[in-house]
Protein backbone atom coordinates (compact mmCIF):
# COMPACT_ATOMS: atom_id res chain seq x y z
CA UNK A 1 0.00 0.00 0.00
CA UNK A 2 1.19 3.48 -0.88
CA UNK A 3 -0.51 6.66 0.36
CA UNK A 4 -0.74 9.89 -1.63
CA UNK A 5 -2.06 13.00 0.13
CA UNK A 6 -4.25 15.30 -1.94
CA UNK A 7 -5.59 18.72 -0.97
CA UNK A 8 -9.30 18.65 -1.72
CA UNK A 9 -11.15 21.97 -1.33
CA UNK A 10 -13.81 21.81 1.41
CA UNK A 11 -16.70 24.24 1.79
CA UNK A 12 -18.65 25.61 4.73
CA UNK A 13 -17.96 25.08 8.42
CA UNK A 14 -15.64 22.09 8.05
CA UNK A 15 -13.55 23.80 5.35
CA UNK A 16 -13.04 26.91 7.47
CA UNK A 17 -12.51 24.84 10.62
CA UNK A 18 -9.67 22.86 9.01
CA UNK A 19 -8.15 26.14 7.83
CA UNK A 20 -8.33 27.41 11.46
CA UNK A 21 -10.59 30.31 10.50
CA UNK A 22 -10.72 32.63 13.51
CA UNK A 23 -14.50 33.08 13.50
CA UNK A 24 -15.56 29.42 13.39
CA UNK A 25 -12.81 28.50 15.87
CA UNK A 26 -14.63 30.56 18.50
CA UNK A 27 -17.55 28.11 18.26
CA UNK A 28 -15.31 25.38 19.71
CA UNK A 29 -13.66 25.31 23.13
CA UNK A 30 -10.22 23.96 22.24
CA UNK A 31 -7.73 24.55 19.46
CA UNK A 32 -6.33 21.40 17.85
CA UNK A 33 -2.85 22.15 19.14
CA UNK A 34 -0.61 20.49 21.71
CA UNK A 35 -1.54 23.25 24.15
CA UNK A 36 -5.24 22.72 23.41
CA UNK A 37 -5.09 19.00 24.18
CA UNK A 38 -3.05 19.59 27.36
CA UNK A 39 -5.65 22.11 28.53
CA UNK A 40 -8.37 19.57 27.84
CA UNK A 41 -6.53 16.99 29.95
CA UNK A 42 -6.22 19.52 32.79
CA UNK A 43 -9.95 20.33 32.60
CA UNK A 44 -10.93 16.63 32.60
CA UNK A 45 -8.92 16.02 35.77
CA UNK A 46 -11.29 18.40 37.56
CA UNK A 47 -14.34 16.40 36.46
CA UNK A 48 -15.90 13.38 38.16
CA UNK A 49 -16.88 10.33 36.09
CA UNK A 50 -18.67 7.14 37.11
CA UNK A 51 -15.78 5.06 35.87
CA UNK A 52 -16.36 1.83 37.78
CA UNK A 53 -20.00 1.51 36.74
CA UNK A 54 -19.09 2.31 33.12
CA UNK A 55 -16.25 -0.24 33.13
CA UNK A 56 -18.56 -2.97 34.45
CA UNK A 57 -21.05 -2.36 31.67
CA UNK A 58 -18.43 -2.10 28.91
CA UNK A 59 -16.77 -5.32 30.05
CA UNK A 60 -20.06 -7.20 29.98
CA UNK A 61 -21.06 -5.82 26.55
CA UNK A 62 -17.70 -6.26 24.82
CA UNK A 63 -17.21 -9.76 26.23
CA UNK A 64 -20.58 -10.70 24.71
CA UNK A 65 -19.13 -9.55 21.38
CA UNK A 66 -16.09 -11.79 21.98
CA UNK A 67 -13.76 -8.81 22.00
CA UNK A 68 -10.01 -9.44 22.10
CA UNK A 69 -7.76 -9.21 25.13
CA UNK A 70 -6.44 -5.76 24.15
CA UNK A 71 -10.01 -4.40 24.27
CA UNK A 72 -10.63 -5.95 27.69
CA UNK A 73 -7.39 -4.42 28.99
CA UNK A 74 -8.37 -1.00 27.63
CA UNK A 75 -11.77 -1.20 29.33
CA UNK A 76 -10.18 -2.18 32.64
CA UNK A 77 -7.76 0.74 32.27
CA UNK A 78 -10.73 3.14 32.18
CA UNK A 79 -11.22 2.52 35.89
CA UNK A 80 -8.02 4.53 36.40
CA UNK A 81 -8.51 8.30 36.65
CA UNK A 82 -5.51 8.81 34.37
CA UNK A 83 -7.11 6.99 31.42
CA UNK A 84 -9.03 8.94 28.77
CA UNK A 85 -10.78 8.21 25.49
CA UNK A 86 -10.84 9.25 21.87
CA UNK A 87 -14.42 8.69 20.77
CA UNK A 88 -16.64 8.86 17.69
CA UNK A 89 -19.78 7.15 16.50
CA UNK A 90 -22.06 6.19 13.67
CA UNK A 91 -25.30 4.41 12.84
CA UNK A 92 -25.27 0.62 12.65
CA UNK A 93 -25.22 0.19 8.87
CA UNK A 94 -25.66 -3.28 7.41
CA UNK A 95 -22.28 -4.82 6.52
CA UNK A 96 -20.87 -1.80 8.46
CA UNK A 97 -22.44 0.71 6.03
CA UNK A 98 -20.43 2.99 3.72
CA UNK A 99 -16.63 2.97 3.92
CA UNK A 100 -16.56 6.19 5.95
CA UNK A 101 -17.73 4.24 9.02
CA UNK A 102 -14.66 2.01 8.83
CA UNK A 103 -12.55 5.11 8.21
CA UNK A 104 -14.00 6.75 11.31
CA UNK A 105 -13.00 3.73 13.41
CA UNK A 106 -9.51 3.85 11.89
CA UNK A 107 -9.36 7.56 12.80
CA UNK A 108 -10.32 6.83 16.41
CA UNK A 109 -7.75 4.04 16.76
CA UNK A 110 -5.00 6.13 15.16
CA UNK A 111 -5.65 9.30 17.18
CA UNK A 112 -5.88 7.38 20.47
CA UNK A 113 -2.38 5.99 19.87
CA UNK A 114 -1.01 9.40 18.92
CA UNK A 115 -2.53 11.19 21.91
CA UNK A 116 -1.34 8.52 24.32
CA UNK A 117 2.21 9.10 23.06
CA UNK A 118 2.07 12.91 22.99
CA UNK A 119 0.16 13.44 26.26
CA UNK A 120 2.01 10.77 28.25
CA UNK A 121 -1.16 9.21 29.65
CA UNK A 122 -3.35 6.21 28.77
CA UNK A 123 -5.78 6.97 25.91
CA UNK A 124 -8.14 4.27 24.60
CA UNK A 125 -10.32 4.17 21.44
CA UNK A 126 -14.12 4.05 21.84
CA UNK A 127 -16.73 3.69 19.09
CA UNK A 128 -20.26 4.80 19.97
CA UNK A 129 -22.92 2.86 18.03
CA UNK A 130 -26.01 5.05 17.57
CA UNK A 131 -28.33 2.21 18.53
CA UNK A 132 -31.23 4.51 19.42
CA UNK A 133 -31.57 5.63 15.80
CA UNK A 134 -34.93 4.49 14.43
CA UNK A 135 -34.51 5.36 10.74
CA UNK A 136 -33.84 1.84 9.43
CA UNK A 137 -34.06 3.09 5.82
CA UNK A 138 -30.73 4.87 6.37
CA UNK A 139 -28.89 1.67 7.30
CA UNK A 140 -30.65 -1.16 5.41
CA UNK A 141 -28.84 -1.02 2.07
CA UNK A 142 -25.56 -1.00 0.23
CA UNK A 143 -24.48 -0.12 -3.31
CA UNK A 144 -23.02 -2.48 -5.92
CA UNK A 145 -22.12 -2.39 -9.61
CA UNK A 146 -24.49 -4.55 -11.62
CA UNK A 147 -24.82 -4.70 -15.42
CA UNK A 148 -22.41 -1.76 -15.69
CA UNK A 149 -24.67 0.39 -13.48
CA UNK A 150 -24.60 1.39 -9.83
CA UNK A 151 -27.48 -0.29 -8.03
CA UNK A 152 -28.84 0.22 -4.52
CA UNK A 153 -29.37 -3.17 -2.87
CA UNK A 154 -32.00 -2.77 -0.15
CA UNK A 155 -32.56 -5.35 2.56
CA UNK A 156 -36.36 -5.49 2.67
CA UNK A 157 -37.07 -6.06 6.32
CA UNK A 158 -39.77 -3.47 6.82
CA UNK A 159 -40.57 -2.01 10.23
CA UNK A 160 -43.78 0.00 10.26
CA UNK A 161 -43.00 1.46 13.67
CA UNK A 162 -40.10 3.72 14.66
CA UNK A 163 -38.17 1.01 16.50
CA UNK A 164 -34.53 1.66 17.36
CA UNK A 165 -31.73 -0.17 15.54
CA UNK A 166 -30.80 -1.83 18.86
CA UNK A 167 -34.25 -3.38 19.01
CA UNK A 168 -34.92 -3.96 15.30
CA UNK A 169 -34.71 -7.72 14.87
CA UNK A 170 -32.93 -9.00 11.81
CA UNK A 171 -33.97 -12.13 9.92
CA UNK A 172 -30.83 -14.26 9.55
CA UNK A 173 -32.32 -16.23 6.67
CA UNK A 174 -33.44 -13.16 4.70
CA UNK A 175 -30.22 -11.26 5.40
CA UNK A 176 -28.13 -14.25 4.26
CA UNK A 177 -29.94 -14.24 0.92
CA UNK A 178 -29.40 -10.48 0.61
CA UNK A 179 -25.67 -10.90 1.28
CA UNK A 180 -25.47 -13.68 -1.34
CA UNK A 181 -27.02 -11.34 -3.92
CA UNK A 182 -24.44 -8.68 -3.09
CA UNK A 183 -21.53 -11.07 -3.45
CA UNK A 184 -22.84 -12.27 -6.81
CA UNK A 185 -21.97 -8.80 -8.12
CA UNK A 186 -18.34 -9.16 -6.94
CA UNK A 187 -15.73 -11.16 -8.87
CA UNK A 188 -14.99 -14.50 -7.22
CA UNK A 189 -11.50 -14.48 -5.69
CA UNK A 190 -9.34 -16.65 -3.44
CA UNK A 191 -10.82 -14.71 -0.51
CA UNK A 192 -14.56 -14.90 -1.34
CA UNK A 193 -15.32 -18.09 0.59
CA UNK A 194 -13.52 -16.92 3.75
CA UNK A 195 -15.14 -13.48 3.65
CA UNK A 196 -18.63 -14.96 3.28
CA UNK A 197 -17.97 -17.34 6.16
CA UNK A 198 -16.64 -14.44 8.26
CA UNK A 199 -19.82 -12.42 7.64
CA UNK A 200 -22.14 -15.41 8.10
CA UNK A 201 -20.62 -16.25 11.48
CA UNK A 202 -21.19 -12.68 12.67
CA UNK A 203 -24.77 -12.73 11.35
CA UNK A 204 -25.69 -16.03 12.98
CA UNK A 205 -24.55 -14.70 16.36
CA UNK A 206 -26.77 -11.61 15.94
CA UNK A 207 -30.41 -10.87 16.62
CA UNK A 208 -30.59 -7.14 15.77
CA UNK A 209 -29.06 -4.63 13.36
CA UNK A 210 -26.76 -3.35 16.12
CA UNK A 211 -25.68 -6.89 17.04
CA UNK A 212 -24.66 -7.63 13.46
CA UNK A 213 -22.84 -4.33 13.07
CA UNK A 214 -21.04 -4.64 16.42
CA UNK A 215 -19.85 -8.19 15.76
CA UNK A 216 -18.45 -7.27 12.34
CA UNK A 217 -16.63 -4.21 13.69
CA UNK A 218 -15.27 -6.24 16.62
CA UNK A 219 -13.91 -8.88 14.23
CA UNK A 220 -12.48 -6.38 11.73
CA UNK A 221 -10.65 -4.43 14.47
CA UNK A 222 -9.88 -7.40 16.70
CA UNK A 223 -6.31 -6.44 17.66
CA UNK A 224 -6.68 -2.67 17.98
CA UNK A 225 -8.08 -2.48 21.51
CA UNK A 226 -11.26 -0.81 20.20
CA UNK A 227 -14.07 -0.52 22.76
CA UNK A 228 -17.66 -0.59 21.50
CA UNK A 229 -20.64 0.97 23.25
CA UNK A 230 -24.28 0.63 22.16
CA UNK A 231 -25.87 3.96 23.04
CA UNK A 232 -29.28 2.31 23.46
CA UNK A 233 -28.25 -0.62 25.63
CA UNK A 234 -30.64 -0.95 28.62
CA UNK A 235 -27.77 -1.27 31.12
CA UNK A 236 -26.10 1.87 29.78
CA UNK A 237 -29.39 3.75 30.18
CA UNK A 238 -29.29 3.00 33.92
CA UNK A 239 -26.05 4.98 34.14
CA UNK A 240 -27.66 7.89 32.30
CA UNK A 241 -30.75 8.44 34.48
CA UNK A 242 -29.34 11.28 36.57
CA UNK A 243 -28.24 13.19 33.48
CA UNK A 244 -31.57 12.62 31.71
CA UNK A 245 -33.19 14.25 34.74
CA UNK A 246 -30.91 17.27 34.34
CA UNK A 247 -31.81 17.54 30.65
CA UNK A 248 -35.53 17.45 31.46
CA UNK A 249 -35.24 20.00 34.27
CA UNK A 250 -33.06 22.37 32.20
CA UNK A 251 -34.66 21.94 28.76
CA UNK A 252 -35.51 25.65 28.51
CA UNK A 253 -31.87 26.60 29.12
CA UNK A 254 -30.80 24.01 26.53
CA UNK A 255 -33.17 25.43 23.94
CA UNK A 256 -32.13 29.02 24.67
CA UNK A 257 -28.43 28.09 24.46
CA UNK A 258 -28.99 26.30 21.16
CA UNK A 259 -30.87 29.29 19.75
CA UNK A 260 -28.16 31.75 20.88
CA UNK A 261 -25.35 29.64 19.45
CA UNK A 262 -27.20 29.23 16.15
CA UNK A 263 -27.53 33.01 15.94
CA UNK A 264 -23.74 33.29 16.21
CA UNK A 265 -23.29 30.66 13.50
CA UNK A 266 -25.69 32.64 11.28
CA UNK A 267 -23.81 35.90 11.94
CA UNK A 268 -20.64 34.15 10.76
CA UNK A 269 -22.35 33.40 7.45
CA UNK A 270 -23.25 29.73 7.91
CA UNK A 271 -26.66 28.09 7.73
CA UNK A 272 -27.56 26.18 10.92
CA UNK A 273 -28.29 22.47 10.44
CA UNK A 274 -30.19 21.56 13.60
CA UNK A 275 -33.92 22.23 13.36
CA UNK A 276 -35.99 22.06 16.54
CA UNK A 277 -39.25 23.44 17.85
CA UNK A 278 -39.06 26.11 20.54
CA UNK A 279 -40.76 23.74 23.01
CA UNK A 280 -38.47 20.76 22.27
CA UNK A 281 -37.22 18.68 25.20
CA UNK A 282 -34.51 16.97 23.10
CA UNK A 283 -35.40 13.57 24.53
CA UNK A 284 -37.23 10.63 22.96
CA UNK A 285 -39.47 8.22 24.85
CA UNK A 286 -40.48 4.77 23.70
CA UNK A 287 -44.26 4.45 23.77
CA UNK A 288 -46.14 1.47 22.30
CA UNK A 289 -42.92 0.19 20.68
CA UNK A 290 -42.39 3.52 18.94
CA UNK A 291 -39.77 6.24 19.56
CA UNK A 292 -41.65 9.48 20.29
CA UNK A 293 -40.04 12.94 20.59
CA UNK A 294 -41.18 14.80 23.70
CA UNK A 295 -42.24 18.46 23.76
CA UNK A 296 -43.45 20.84 26.43
CA UNK A 297 -47.04 22.08 26.22
CA UNK A 298 -48.87 24.01 28.95
CA UNK A 299 -46.65 22.63 31.69
CA UNK A 300 -46.97 19.04 30.46
CA UNK A 301 -44.54 16.85 28.54
CA UNK A 302 -46.35 15.58 25.46
CA UNK A 303 -45.70 13.40 22.44
CA UNK A 304 -47.39 13.11 19.06
CA UNK A 305 -49.21 16.46 19.34
CA UNK A 306 -50.65 15.69 22.76
CA UNK A 307 -51.73 12.08 22.22
CA UNK A 308 -49.36 11.20 25.08
CA UNK A 309 -49.04 13.50 28.08
CA UNK A 310 -47.02 13.40 31.32
CA UNK A 311 -46.44 15.69 34.25
CA UNK A 312 -42.84 16.40 35.27
CA UNK A 313 -43.21 14.05 38.25
CA UNK A 314 -44.67 11.27 36.09
CA UNK A 315 -41.85 11.59 33.58
CA UNK A 316 -39.14 11.47 36.26
CA UNK A 317 -40.79 8.43 37.85
CA UNK A 318 -40.93 6.72 34.44
CA UNK A 319 -37.23 7.49 33.93
CA UNK A 320 -36.28 5.94 37.24
CA UNK A 321 -38.37 2.82 36.68
CA UNK A 322 -37.71 2.26 32.94
CA UNK A 323 -34.64 4.21 31.80
CA UNK A 324 -34.35 2.02 28.68
CA UNK A 325 -37.45 3.79 27.31
CA UNK A 326 -35.56 7.08 26.95
CA UNK A 327 -33.01 8.20 24.37
CA UNK A 328 -31.27 11.33 23.13
CA UNK A 329 -31.76 13.43 20.03
CA UNK A 330 -29.11 15.18 17.92
CA UNK A 331 -28.67 17.92 20.55
CA UNK A 332 -28.37 15.79 23.69
CA UNK A 333 -26.46 12.78 22.30
CA UNK A 334 -23.10 14.65 22.41
CA UNK A 335 -23.93 15.81 25.94
CA UNK A 336 -24.61 12.27 27.15
CA UNK A 337 -21.35 11.13 25.58
CA UNK A 338 -19.54 13.93 27.42
CA UNK A 339 -21.27 12.97 30.69
CA UNK A 340 -20.23 9.31 30.43
CA UNK A 341 -16.73 9.36 28.95
CA UNK A 342 -13.54 11.28 29.90
CA UNK A 343 -13.07 12.42 26.31
CA UNK A 344 -9.74 13.84 25.22
CA UNK A 345 -10.95 14.13 21.58
CA UNK A 346 -14.09 13.59 19.54
CA UNK A 347 -13.72 12.37 15.95
CA UNK A 348 -16.37 13.82 13.63
CA UNK A 349 -17.31 13.82 9.97
CA UNK A 350 -18.04 17.03 8.02
CA UNK A 351 -21.74 17.06 8.94
CA UNK A 352 -21.05 16.41 12.61
CA UNK A 353 -18.49 19.21 12.82
CA UNK A 354 -21.03 21.58 11.30
CA UNK A 355 -23.75 20.76 13.82
CA UNK A 356 -21.35 20.61 16.77
CA UNK A 357 -20.51 24.26 16.03
CA UNK A 358 -24.12 24.95 17.08
CA UNK A 359 -23.78 23.19 20.45
CA UNK A 360 -21.04 25.09 22.28
CA UNK A 361 -23.38 27.03 24.58
CA UNK A 362 -25.48 23.90 25.16
CA UNK A 363 -22.39 22.16 26.59
CA UNK A 364 -21.84 25.17 28.84
CA UNK A 365 -25.37 24.88 30.32
CA UNK A 366 -24.13 21.75 32.12
CA UNK A 367 -20.70 23.21 32.94
CA UNK A 368 -19.10 21.02 30.27
CA UNK A 369 -16.45 22.13 27.82
CA UNK A 370 -16.89 20.80 24.30
CA UNK A 371 -14.03 18.31 23.70
CA UNK A 372 -11.49 18.96 20.94
CA UNK A 373 -13.33 18.12 17.72
CA UNK A 374 -11.02 16.39 15.24
CA UNK A 375 -12.10 15.85 11.61
CA UNK A 376 -11.98 12.15 10.74
CA UNK A 377 -9.53 10.86 8.16
CA UNK A 378 -10.87 10.79 4.60
CA UNK A 379 -9.65 7.90 2.45
CA UNK A 380 -10.09 6.59 -1.10
CA UNK A 381 -8.71 3.36 -2.54
CA UNK A 382 -7.19 3.32 -6.01
CA UNK A 383 -6.79 -0.13 -7.54
CA UNK A 384 -4.12 -0.99 -10.10
CA UNK A 385 -6.46 -1.13 -13.09
CA UNK A 386 -7.82 2.31 -12.16
CA UNK A 387 -4.28 3.71 -11.95
CA UNK A 388 -3.62 2.24 -15.42
CA UNK A 389 -6.79 3.89 -16.76
CA UNK A 390 -5.67 7.24 -15.34
CA UNK A 391 -2.32 7.04 -17.06
CA UNK A 392 -3.87 5.86 -20.34
CA UNK A 393 -6.09 8.96 -20.33
CA UNK A 394 -3.16 11.26 -19.47
CA UNK A 395 -4.80 12.28 -16.18
CA UNK A 396 -3.04 13.11 -12.93
CA UNK A 397 -3.73 10.99 -9.83
CA UNK A 398 -5.38 13.95 -8.10
CA UNK A 399 -7.68 14.86 -11.03
CA UNK A 400 -10.65 12.64 -10.04
CA UNK A 401 -10.69 14.25 -6.58
CA UNK A 402 -10.34 17.92 -7.51
CA UNK A 403 -11.94 18.08 -10.97
CA UNK A 404 -15.31 17.15 -12.47
CA UNK A 405 -14.87 13.79 -14.22
CA UNK A 406 -17.83 14.45 -16.54
CA UNK A 407 -16.17 17.65 -17.75
CA UNK A 408 -12.83 15.88 -18.13
CA UNK A 409 -14.57 13.24 -20.23
CA UNK A 410 -16.27 15.83 -22.44
CA UNK A 411 -13.02 17.73 -22.86
CA UNK A 412 -11.19 14.55 -23.81
CA UNK A 413 -13.86 13.64 -26.37
CA UNK A 414 -13.78 17.14 -27.90
CA UNK A 415 -10.01 16.90 -28.23
CA UNK A 416 -10.37 13.84 -30.46
CA UNK A 417 -11.67 15.99 -33.34
CA UNK A 418 -9.96 18.89 -35.08
CA UNK A 419 -12.55 21.46 -34.01
CA UNK A 420 -14.57 21.51 -30.76
CA UNK A 421 -17.94 19.89 -31.49
CA UNK A 422 -20.06 21.99 -29.12
CA UNK A 423 -18.55 25.29 -30.26
CA UNK A 424 -19.11 24.40 -33.92
CA UNK A 425 -22.77 23.57 -33.35
CA UNK A 426 -23.30 26.64 -31.15
CA UNK A 427 -21.90 28.75 -33.97
CA UNK A 428 -24.17 27.01 -36.50
CA UNK A 429 -27.25 27.57 -34.33
CA UNK A 430 -26.42 31.25 -33.84
CA UNK A 431 -25.87 31.78 -37.58
CA UNK A 432 -29.11 29.96 -38.37
CA UNK A 433 -31.03 32.08 -35.84
CA UNK A 434 -29.64 35.29 -37.35
CA UNK A 435 -30.63 34.19 -40.87
CA UNK A 436 -34.02 32.88 -39.76
CA UNK A 437 -34.78 36.02 -37.74
CA UNK A 438 -34.28 38.11 -40.88
CA UNK A 439 -36.38 35.60 -42.86
CA UNK A 440 -39.23 35.75 -40.30
CA UNK A 441 -39.31 39.55 -40.50
CA UNK A 442 -39.57 39.30 -44.29
CA UNK A 443 -42.40 36.71 -44.09
CA UNK A 444 -44.23 38.76 -41.46
CA UNK A 445 -44.21 41.87 -43.66
CA UNK A 446 -45.74 39.96 -46.57
CA UNK A 447 -48.09 37.61 -44.68
CA UNK A 448 -48.51 38.21 -40.91
CA UNK A 449 -50.70 35.11 -40.74
CA UNK A 450 -47.60 32.93 -41.16
CA UNK A 451 -45.87 34.38 -38.07
CA UNK A 452 -46.68 31.41 -35.81
CA UNK A 453 -45.75 28.88 -38.50
CA UNK A 454 -42.44 30.69 -39.11
CA UNK A 455 -41.64 30.40 -35.39
CA UNK A 456 -42.38 26.67 -35.46
CA UNK A 457 -40.20 26.36 -38.55
CA UNK A 458 -37.27 27.92 -36.66
CA UNK A 459 -37.74 25.55 -33.72
CA UNK A 460 -37.81 22.52 -36.04
CA UNK A 461 -34.57 23.61 -37.70
CA UNK A 462 -33.06 24.06 -34.21
CA UNK A 463 -34.22 20.56 -33.24
CA UNK A 464 -32.71 19.09 -36.40
CA UNK A 465 -29.34 20.72 -35.67
CA UNK A 466 -29.47 19.40 -32.09
CA UNK A 467 -30.36 15.93 -33.40
CA UNK A 468 -27.38 16.05 -35.74
CA UNK A 469 -25.15 17.09 -32.83
CA UNK A 470 -26.41 14.20 -30.69
CA UNK A 471 -25.89 11.70 -33.51
CA UNK A 472 -22.36 12.96 -34.12
CA UNK A 473 -21.55 12.69 -30.40
CA UNK A 474 -22.99 9.17 -30.25
CA UNK A 475 -20.88 8.12 -33.22
CA UNK A 476 -17.81 9.69 -31.61
CA UNK A 477 -18.55 7.83 -28.38
CA UNK A 478 -18.87 4.53 -30.25
CA UNK A 479 -15.60 5.23 -32.06
CA UNK A 480 -13.84 5.93 -28.74
CA UNK A 481 -15.76 3.40 -26.64
CA UNK A 482 -12.63 1.82 -25.12
CA UNK A 483 -11.32 5.12 -23.75
CA UNK A 484 -14.74 6.34 -22.60
CA UNK A 485 -15.23 3.08 -20.69
CA UNK A 486 -12.08 3.99 -18.80
CA UNK A 487 -13.71 7.27 -17.75
CA UNK A 488 -16.77 5.32 -16.62
CA UNK A 489 -14.61 2.96 -14.56
CA UNK A 490 -12.87 5.95 -12.97
CA UNK A 491 -16.23 7.49 -12.15
CA UNK A 492 -17.63 4.31 -10.61
CA UNK A 493 -14.46 3.56 -8.64
CA UNK A 494 -13.59 7.02 -7.29
CA UNK A 495 -16.67 9.25 -7.66
CA UNK A 496 -19.68 6.89 -7.68
CA UNK A 497 -22.98 8.75 -8.08
CA UNK A 498 -20.89 11.94 -8.11
CA UNK A 499 -20.00 11.42 -4.44
CA UNK A 500 -16.75 10.51 -2.67
CA UNK A 501 -15.97 6.79 -2.85
CA UNK A 502 -16.22 6.39 0.93
CA UNK A 503 -19.83 7.64 0.98
CA UNK A 504 -21.08 4.95 -1.43
CA UNK A 505 -19.00 1.77 -1.53
CA UNK A 506 -18.85 -0.83 1.22
CA UNK A 507 -15.79 -2.49 2.77
CA UNK A 508 -16.94 -5.99 1.71
CA UNK A 509 -15.84 -5.37 -1.89
CA UNK A 510 -12.29 -4.72 -0.68
CA UNK A 511 -12.31 -7.66 1.74
CA UNK A 512 -13.33 -9.86 -1.18
CA UNK A 513 -10.56 -8.45 -3.39
CA UNK A 514 -7.72 -8.20 -0.86
CA UNK A 515 -8.51 -10.50 2.05
CA UNK A 516 -9.83 -10.38 5.60
CA UNK A 517 -6.73 -8.54 6.83
CA UNK A 518 -7.43 -5.59 4.50
CA UNK A 519 -8.80 -3.33 7.28
CA UNK A 520 -5.93 -4.29 9.58
CA UNK A 521 -3.39 -3.28 6.92
CA UNK A 522 -5.15 0.03 6.25
CA UNK A 523 -5.30 0.75 9.99
CA UNK A 524 -1.54 0.26 10.33
CA UNK A 525 -0.69 2.91 7.71
CA UNK A 526 0.56 6.37 8.72
CA UNK A 527 -1.80 9.31 8.19
CA UNK A 528 -1.63 13.09 8.46
CA UNK A 529 -4.18 15.11 10.44
CA UNK A 530 -3.84 18.17 8.21
CA UNK A 531 -7.18 17.90 6.38
CA UNK A 532 -5.73 16.29 3.24
CA UNK A 533 -7.46 13.42 1.47
CA UNK A 534 -5.58 10.12 1.65
CA UNK A 535 -5.50 8.07 -1.56
CA UNK A 536 -4.29 4.54 -0.91
CA UNK A 537 -2.89 2.85 -3.99
CA UNK A 538 -3.52 -0.90 -3.81
Curated annotation (Swiss-Prot):
It holds the Pfam family CC_BshC. Its EC number is 6.-.-.-. Keywords: Coiled coil, Ligase. Residues 421-485 form a coiled coil. InterPro entries: Bacillithiol_biosynth_BshC, CC_BshC, Rossmann-like_BshC. GO terms for molecular function: ligase activity. Belongs to the BshC family. Involved in bacillithiol (BSH) biosynthesis. May catalyze the last step of the pathway, the addition of cysteine to glucosamine malate (GlcN-Mal) to generate BSH. HAMAP family: BshC (MF_01867). This is Putative cysteine ligase BshC. It comes from Bacillus cytotoxicus (strain DSM 22905 / CIP 110041 / 391-98 / NVH 391-98). The gene is bshC.
